[in-house]
Swiss-Prot record:
The gene is scn4ab. CDD domains: Na_channel_gate. One of its GO terms (cellular component) is voltage-gated sodium channel complex. I repeats lie at residues 108-431. It comes from Takifugu rubripes. GO terms for molecular function: voltage-gated sodium channel activity. It holds the Pfam family Ion_trans. Residues 369-393, 682-702, 1120-1141, 1411-1433 dip into the membrane without crossing it. Voltage-gated sodium (Nav) channels consist of an ion-conducting alpha subunit which is functional on its own associated with regulatory beta subunits. Belongs to the sodium channel (TC 1.A.1.10) family. Nav1.4/SCN4A subfamily. This is Sodium channel protein type 4 subunit alpha B. PANTHER family: SODIUM CHANNEL PROTEIN TYPE 4 SUBUNIT ALPHA, VOLTAGE-GATED CATION CHANNEL CALCIUM AND SODIUM. InterPro entries: Ion_trans_dom, Na_channel_asu, Na_chnl_inactivation_gate, Na_trans_assoc_dom, VGCC_Ca_Na, Volt_channel_dom_sf. Residues 1199-1201 are annotated as: Important for rapid channel inactivation.
Amino acid sequence: MRTLLPPVGSEVFRRFTQSSLNEIQQKQQIREEERKRTNAQVSEELPEPASDLEAGKPLPFIYGEPPHELLNVPLEDIDPFYQSQKTFIVLSKGNIIYRFNAESSLYLLSPFNALRIVAIKILIHSLFSLFIMATILTNCAFMTLSDPPAWSKTMEYVFTFIYTFEATIKILSRGFCVGKFTFLKDPWNWLDFMVISMAYLTELVDLGNVSVLRTFRVLRALKTITVIPGLKTIVGALIQSVRKLADAMVLTVFCLSVFALIGLQLFMGNLRQKCVLIPQWLYGNLTFDINSTNGYYGNDTHDNGTKSKHLEFEFERHINNPDNYYYLTGQGDPLLCGNSSDAGVCPESYVCLKVGANPNYGYTSYDSFGWAFLALFRLMTQDFWENLFQLTLRTAGKTYMIFFVVVIFLGSFYLINLILAVVAMAYAEQNEATLAEAKEKEEEYIHILEALKKREEEQAARKEPHSTVEGFEDDHRLCPPCWYAFANIFLKWDCCGCWRHLKECLYAIVMDPFVDLGITICIILNTVFMAMEHYPMSADFEELLSVGNLVFTGIFTGEMVFKILAMDPYFYFQVGWNIFDSIIVTISLVELGLANVQGLSVLRSFRLMRVFKLAKSWPTLNMLIKIIGNSVGALGNLTLVLAIIVFIFAVVGMQLFGKNYKDCVCRISEDCVLPRWHMNDFFHAFLIIFRVLCGEWIESMWDCMEVSGQTMCLIVFMMVLVIGNLVVLNLFLALLLSSFSGDNLTTQDDEGENNLQIAINRINRAMSWTKTYILLYVYTLTESNLNQHFAVSDDEEQRRVKDILALTSVSSDKLVSHHCGNDFFRVPIAEAESDSDDSDYDEDKDSQCDESSVCSSVQKPEVQEEEMDENCVAKTPTDCWTKKCYSRCPFLDIDTSQGRGKIWCNIRRTCFSIVENNYFESFIVFMILLSSGALAFEDIYLEKHQLIKSILEYADKVFTYVFVMEMVLKWFAYGFKSYFSNAWCWLDFLIVDVSLVSLTANILGYSELGAIKSLRTLRALRPLRALSRFEGMRVVVNALVGAVPSIFNVLLVCLIFWLIFSIMGVNLFAGKFSYCFNETSQEIIDTKVVDNKTECIALIKANFTEVRWKNVKVNYDNVGIGYLSLLQVATFKGWTDIMYAAVDSRDVESQPIYEVNLYMYLYFVIFIIFGSFFTLNLFIGVIIDNFNQQKAKLGGQDIFMTEEQKKYYNAMKKLGSKKPQKPVPRPENPFQGLVFDLVTKQIFDVFIMVLICLNMVTMMVETDEQSDKKEEVLYWINVVFILIFTTECTLKIIALRRHYFSIGWNIFDFVVVILSILGLLLADIIEKYFVSPTLFRVIRLARIGRVLRLIRGAKGIRTLLFALMMSLPALFNIGLLLFLIMFIFSIFGMSNFAYVKKEALIDDMFNFETFGNSMICLFMITTSAGWDGLLSPIMNTPPDCDPNVENPGTTVRGNCGSPAIGIAFFSTYIIMSFLVVVNMFIAIILENFNVATEESSDPLCEDDFEMFYETWEKFDPDASQFIQYSKLSDFCDTLKEPLRIPQPNTIKLISMDLPLVPGDRIHCMDILLALTAEVLGDSDEMDTLKATMEEKFMANNPSKVSYEPISSTLLRKEEEVAATVIQRAYRKYLLLRTVRLASFMYREKTEGRGKEKAPETTGLLCKQFSQLYGFNKETDEPLQSKANRLGQVELQSEVLLHAVPPLRSSEFLQERDQRETSV
């Protein structure tokens, strides 16, 4: 930008005239001639376009204000880049830059043409943009009309005319398509062109389906992007994100395809298995075949089978009649069933047959690849997957839960979060680039301002009235000067001295910290008062809350008034919090005045905003509000883009499907009334699109496909899901996560203490002072009494007083930090008993060193164990008691050197050696596992198996005795002090106590008491003891303990946020969700019959016993249950029922009417945006960031892996650590050699890959109940593929011999081939002799193994799977922790919910009756799926359940649940699993994805090193690690990019200076390092990489150590060049001497100069030269030939080689060029 600063005195803005155009043309002509003359590209020397002078941006302030007469007229371009091109600029009124071509527009209109100038003026005018924007918005409003009026057609013509006029103006001013800044060169103008073209097409040409074409009009909404400049940028970022999704999308589609194929093979046709009523006339006549569609064999053989045919016809009609299927209450689809042992069973009189259609209109099935793919995609996106899970397990069996576990963990947790990672990374890169650009601009602006200051000084010297900087500052004042004058007069109140004195007094009061404390307490009390509102309330309580509201409103009003008086309005409203206070107080006062006005009760909700005032004194809440504020600011454009996307898809849905919903409504609704989710009008279409953005799309899509056809609905819904949910919302999340770091969620000490902290500190100091003097007074009284009996010296007394004062003067903060530090989490380990006088703290520190303790550590990660190990002996027990205990009870201090004390010491040492023994540790772990496993058997069937019950009772006693024994041994070994100072030992102690109390109660016969039963459920915590014993789980818990403060902070803030929405929900919906219900017909009584509760109660009193006034279980009757409602809405489970009740609600105790309160949907929309999108995603952010902080404190080590797992992780990350392998030798046998050549060619691998793809396609076309012909064709195709792959396997074994099994992929291929052959052979046997379709299906899965071979050839997929492999150790540890949590909650669920009534999602398969069923339910709700359906029956209370009903086989009575326990159980599990543990999965996957992406985005990756060594094998068949120097050129040419150096490459290789070892050989690592440096360049990172690679290679290949280089390629070349130079110089010298001698001899002969001495040296040299290079008289051998024979060896002596300094490569090349030039 410094280059853009115009020189002083220069004319910056010049009109664009004909002479300007001629000047540009002259410059272009000169440049063209120069280019032709020098044959070089002059354009390369031109500067880059200035980013600040781009079209559409405002003119930088450094150019000053352009003269008014130069606005809206063509000017010469001020960008140096364009000054030599045919362009000009126009500045609009707001100094916005517009750039145009100087060429003639449409070959007709020059830049100086009047028409074009008018068009330009219209185009750049702000009113024109506003007019177009208003037109677009009006057009959008018309598009939302589902039933437009007749005159709307006229409006369409008007809109089309306006858009045509806009395009015409653009084309006239810019040109159409030829030139850089013409109309069609801007991609956004393509949109305009397409919109206008489609408008004319639909009017002029009859194209059939007009409704489809009319939807193209919605693209006009995208024109807003072209009008609002900021939107183009964010759309560009979105497009970049989508481009980067390529690999992740490919991997996702591939994995989904594989899973869909597995689902197709395992579950094809299963979901058609239904419970069909057995007709009475068929009993005894037929035998049912469960696998046949007919389902029977006839037993009767009458004449010509007449009766059998009749029965066949009747039976066929019977089983295809939906009325004969079994339906559960409230379900539209019949009950599914299966025929395996663990599948769902049919009720009595029903049989399981495969008949009828699939569930959900037939769209949920695995019957073909397409439907299976849709089902798996639904499973991956976790939309209503609990339904698919239940249907599949009910038909196939519970064993297949494994399939769902794999798909959820791989597909949902991994693949979906890969998309998040890619989008987040794309945003991060863009953000970094923006920040870098901003930093660069900042530096440039500093220089610019310096230049402006100099200019200002010059202007001041010339006495100019206004400088540039002053002008700039004046321009940036917020208000006109008149407003400042008004403010000084009316908003600053300085009347007289007494008024100022009053103000000072008021200021001192309102700014006092204690006043702030009082206001904060009032805010909290006000919030409590608002939260106490509930339904039903007594009149007195309601009056109390009303008075409380008046009081608090008065207090806050008074605070505002006093602050305004104290600070003056001018300064009061300068503070943001004061503005906020004034708004809330004003609304509160308005609400009081309008309290009785109907419909304005929503104003009461604004009082809730006072809660945010807590942020002034609560740093975490303040930071969260700032985060949301920053995010909303950054999300402004993105929100607008999302709104446009939602609008477009809503209009598209309404235009395409709205009419179909109305016409075909009977297909999806029994009473032919539009369902709640439809697209017949814009508002409902908007709700469906918003629901899809929330992740719920499948149910709406089923309805759409049923009424409008499958293809179009699939396309629209998939587009909304991918664009809206996966891209835009993930970008929202990326922006949110980038808005904060973990440091933001901690108190900012730099800002100093706020008033609240000052007030609290004052109170603490006052309390401390009071406490000190009370203690001193008490001490004085007691001492005076004691001194009468004991003589105490004054010095000792003074020392005690000082101790008391010192103790009490410690602040509470320090006391807390001392007692709640990391030491509480350390492991107490006993060490040698000592009588030393060290402090307790030092003893604790010394006693916490050994990690072998049974109560293992939950040490925070940042504590380094090495620091503690220096002083540790830890071989003998520590003291039993603390020093205080010994001082208070001296008899505890026993002399351990003699007598009983010595015996006691020996006993302790024996106990210590026992508990420290590894065998004891292993035994205890084994007992923990056994005791935990025993809990799993205590299900509802235990009473039926008395033997197992007896065994479990005895085992429980044994476990209790063993754990008591372990506890006592540890008491003896470690002492009470060490044992009870450790959290894990406390946990052990409490769990043992529970078992002990339970056992004692059983022995005494009190086991049936309610309290004892409740206590027994706590035995479910027994598996927690395993946490400290398994290192993998322990490291995860360590990380979690470190994250707990941040998680708790976010949880607390979320609760505050949700409190506002919960209180608002109570205000809006309390008492309005009830309805009058007919228990017999299971229907709500119509409002025409019963209008409210009073009428319903009257109906009940009139002996209508089947009628009940019921309430929705999850409602807003109080704040507590409101929280539960919000949790269901935030997790999108059960939220639709709550919304339905809300939009149907009228008044308190009134019957609901269908969608009477339609716009209450907006309450839920707003909560989902702020309560779900923001707050729940904060959990992800804080967990990721906290773990990153912990990792940084540990020096970058992974906090989720044990030391052994870190070794695996590092092995996975090794780069370049391979060594050359000896290639498989070509067989000598000619036939084998021929086969070897075939299988090692690349074309062979390509051919096999193509066949694998074809095999995948053939598997995809398989369907349920396909024709016999198709089945036979597919069978033989499968046989052909098996033969081909078997042939491939055989050929490779023949060619590679034993080496075949040394390659992992070959072993995989071999296993797949064997399994395929077994599947082919066993299929017939299984079909003939067994009736086990499960085994048959599992065998067929082997075919899918072939598809996985595609991974071998897909680099991008391998990179992403490599990230997964790196994540496995940490994921395994977190999986273990998740399993432990599920195990504990399963046991707890079995204890409390085993007998609840079967309704909603609890049925005969999904319940808490057995451990297996509990685990299935908990796995389902780990993703939050279906937890509302499991909670609903548990919340049943009489009369919805019967507390006295008998449960067969047990003494337990009743089928009611416990609402309080159920809510606590599910809420806790959702928070622990869904919000914490699952987010830990996400954190690890994102981190390892980043690592893998960085490696794959590097210029070099693992594949390149692999390619290097594969090529090396061809040049070094013996794997000696060396090749000849002569082969180097060919080797480097044979390599593939990026390592390849194509021939001719001799000079390049010489300049790389590769070390040579004896024998002119080069080592592979030296070549690899040199090539790597060539690709990456020289940098510190390169040096580090070199060192790492060399170190790894040396470790793997010690053979390199014995070879030391004696030279290098560059040195060798330098030696050769030096020798050549010396040879040439020497020959030249000899030749010169020879000429001189010849001249001397000639002169002697002709002139006879006898006095001249002959040059003897020269003569001697000439003689030598003659001997060396002269003619041999005997053979007449030429000079050159003799030189070749003798000279080379003799001249290349060591003296000559080292007589000259070595030349570097550049010097050598220079010298060579000089020599060649001179020659």
